[in-house]
Amino acid sequence: SKVQYGIYSQGESRSNKNQGTVIQLNNIDLTSTANTAVAGVYLGFENNAQISGNTIKNISNSTKTVAGIALGLLPSLNMNVFNGNDVANSVISLNTIRDIARIGDGSAFGITMAAVIAGGSSTNELSNNMLFNINSTAATTMDYIAGILVGGGAVGTTKVLYNTIKLAG
């Protein structure tokens, strides 16, 4: 199959975010012989979202950067800008994310989170997730591989707690 996202949810704007989205207990397997997947779950402009108990696996692409869960930040080859469609006051927990691969040179991430840049105080929590086999098959010094990538920002707090990360298989 040729699908880019297992689950995609996008609010209208920073001032009109989706409220209370729940993504729970899904099995997202984007196995594709064409290597066309980008992310298992993508959320943008969300408030009070919960992503928990999901199994996300076999995300691969030969032309784009890939992620298991992307929160307001669609990964790019050059990860030096962390602003995006921010997700606020949300909990991402108890997910298993595995076999995320950029085929060839490029970047791959287990979980990405954009910086929260406006809207007052916000607390996001990434906890008790298990991430493994996150890789690029021909990474160069310009490529970026990370289990969890969190963009910094002046507004809000991000708690990264009790996750298990093993980049290799």
Task: Please give the residue ranges for each predicted region.
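Right-handed parallel beta-helix
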Residues: 1, 16-32, 47-61, 70, ...
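Extracellular beta-strand/beta-solenoid scaffold signature
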Residues: 2-15, 33-45, 62-84, 103-117, ...
